[in-house]
Amino acid sequence: MGETEKRIETHRIRCLSKLKMFLLAITCAFVSKTLSGSYMNSMLTQIERQFNIPTSLVGFINGSFEIGNLLLIIFVSYFGTKLHRPIMIGIGCVVMGLGCFLKSLPHFLMNQYEYESTVSVSGNLSSNSFLCMENGTQILRPTQDPSECTKEVKSLMWVYVLVGNIVRGMGETPILPLGISYIEDFAKFENSPLYIGLVETGAIIGPLIGLLLASFCANVYVDTGFVNTDDLIITPTDTRWVGAWWFGFLICAGVNVLTAIPFFFLPNTLPKEGLETNADIIKNENEDKQKEEVKKEKYGITKDFLPFMKSLSCNPIYMLFILVSVIQFNAFVNMISFMPKYLEQQYGISSSDAIFLMGIYNLPPICIGYIIGGLIMKKFKITVKQAAHIGCWLSLLEYLLYFLSFLMTCENSSVVGINTSYEGIPQDLYVENDIFADCNVDCNCPSKIWDPVCGNNGLSYLSACLAGCETSIGTGINMVFQNCSCIQTSGNSSAVLGLCDKGPDCSLMLQYFLILSAMSSFIYSLAAIPGYMVLLRCMKSEEKSLGVGLHTFCTRVFAGIPAPIYFGALMDSTCLHWGTLKCGESGACRIYDSTTFRYIYLGLPAALRGSSFVPALIILILLRKCHLPGENASSGTELIETKVKGKENECKDIYQKSTVLKDDELKTKL
């Protein structure tokens, strides 16, 4: 008996360690996939400026990830469970690495980035011809011949980013459905929420790392190492600045490939957690069942697909949960993807600072919320109906708190000729002819070049020329323009490069907004695990993998793909001034109407999320009357344990009977 117990204990430890190894590996996979995703979302503004494309096209590039995911999600979700799940996940990680590498390629295939400017590097181009020169001619930085512009290769280099994002989406497909179903299959019923909470925590650590990496890369000039950064006349707060977006994609590619390695050494199946000590007792029974299943799969691997789809489609709670998810994903995809741009435009900070603050204030509370949510589910053994109520009412509380963000606003940047007159009076409608005034009408200034300067009167101007500046001192970012006839101040009128700061009040509003965002993130993350358990428990155990995959499919199709596109188009509609390329074509937007931008960024998600509570309340009503298939999961485990105990009792009876017989034989012989 001692050897048998030792062998069973060894087997238990080995199986337990393999499950823990899978948990560690899948958590790392969630870290790597969310690292890549958050980095991509954070670099949207940099990509927009690098390729001089509108926000709607950037939204399409961002949504292309979902297209790649859709190509495989149903196939992987259903057939993946019939194959070797850990190996499928490992292959997916490698493919994600390939996609990230493809996204970095344009940097190595195109020329150096050139931003629009009237100012030369030395500040002494043709005797300061970029300044106001009455009865003169503006000599701008050299432009290409129009015939050469049409042949410029970099105009379509964004296609590499598009294709790379599609490939990354294809690679990420197996991680969520196969990883979650693997945990559900082999973890204890009461441990499953905690394990999923830990995995989801990895999905928060990844974005935190991704945002920190993005913040660093956004602060490094795109062509660092190839140009002298001391000669730059723009800073990270300038809307023409482009960070080293390509560098982070290379790091993401390496991380994804390294994450794939452990999955190739993990088993496809494990004994149910908690029953490993009795593995030998039920070993033969499991082997017989597995042989029968293999035979069935060989001759009809697809026979259950349509019945499963029909069963899920006729499950009202499952379908309503998908509807809630689609509506809320439309809101959150937009908020997360364009939050750095919102912080830049609303509060006047750099892309690097916006990304950093977004990560520091939002992700730690979400991480803590996921862990606490999982612990609550485990500690108090929350039922599905209780979990649904917790998820719904916490989401409603966070939703009401969200409306306070409408109060934390800053005024538009006052740019003369766009939203402010030369007298400093705000104007609502931008008219191109309004950029000229008596003070600069004879300066022969270009009307479309975005090269802003900040006057010592607190107003910004499109360029030093339009500010009426006649002289300059200094070079690079330290250049100061003097004798500016359009700047109405007492004494010497002067201006410096860049837009004027929005002031200390705006910085205070930014802090309030970030604190509110952190509170909202924590409350909403508390509801995430209970809500996800409703999804898992409203399906039969054999339908879970397909159900999770179909849920992901629907959120991708109806939220992940269209949301960034229509949201980006709405943002483009608030643009006040577009950048100008060498040949006169429109580039990326340089400044938005921050008031309208705020109403779109905050108002549209508020409307979407508000409508999602209607199907959520219907779910609560249905749960009062329905008996969910997942509620039998624990009883299924208990049945197995009862069966095992029954077999153990049979073994004890046989052993006792044999002992009695041996005693009788011994007495007879004596």
UniProtKB/Swiss-Prot annotation:
Location in the cell reads:
Cell membrane; Basal cell membrane
Stored InterPro entries: Kazal_dom, Kazal_dom_sf, MFS_dom, MFS_trans_sf, OATP
Q: Which CDD domains match?
A: MFS_SLCO1A_OATP1A
Activity regulation annotation text: Transport activity is inhibited by the grapefruit juice component naringin.
**Transmembrane stretches, start-end:** 21-40, 60-80, 87-111, 156-184, 204-224, 243-267, 312-333, 354-377, 382-405, 514-536, 546-571, 606-623
Q: Any S-S bridges, and between which cysteines?
A: C439-C469, C445-C465, C454-C486
Q: In which tissues is it expressed?
A: Higher expression in the brain than in liver and kidney. Expressed in brain neurons in both cortex and hippocampus. Expressed in placental trophoblasts. Also expressed in lung and testes at lower levels. Expressed in the eye (at protein level). Expressed in the retina in the outer and inner nuclear layers, the inner plexiform layer and the ganglion cell layer. Expressed in liver and prostate. In testis, primarily localized to the basal membrane of Sertoli cells and weakly expressed in Leydig cells and within the tubules. Expressed in fetal brain and liver.
Write out the GO biological process terms. Answer: bile acid and bile salt transport; monoatomic ion transport; organic anion transport; sodium-independent organic anion transport; xenobiotic metabolic process
Which domain of life does the protein's organism represent? Eukaryota
Q: Provide the glycosylation site positions.
A: N124, N135, N412, N419
What does the record say about its membrane topology?
Multi-pass membrane protein
Q: Give residue spans on the Extracellular membrane side.
A: 41-59, 112-155, 225-242, 334-353, 406-513, 572-605
Chain ranges of the Kazal-like domain: 433-488
Q: Does the keyword Amino-acid biosynthesis apply?
A: no
Molecular-function annotations in GO: bile acid transmembrane transporter activity; organic anion transmembrane transporter activity; organic cation transmembrane transporter activity; sodium-independent organic anion transmembrane transporter activity; transmembrane transporter activity
Q: Which GO terms describe its cellular component?
A: apical plasma membrane; basal plasma membrane; basolateral plasma membrane; plasma membrane
The entry sums up its family as follows:
Belongs to the organo anion transporter (TC 2.A.60) family.
Protein task:
Na(+)-independent transporter that mediates the cellular uptake of a broad range of organic anions such as the endogenous bile salts cholate and deoxycholate, either in their unconjugated or conjugated forms (taurocholate and glycocholate), at the plasmam membrane. Responsible for intestinal absorption of bile acids. Transports dehydroepiandrosterone 3-sulfate (DHEAS), a major circulating steroid secreted by the adrenal cortex, as well as estrone 3-sulfate and 17beta-estradiol 17-O-(beta-D-glucuronate).
> Any notes on this protein's domains?
A conserved histidine residue in the third TMD (His-107) may play an essential role in the pH sensitivity of SLCO1A2/OATP1A2-mediated substrate transport.
- Entry protein name: Solute carrier organic anion transporter family member 1A2
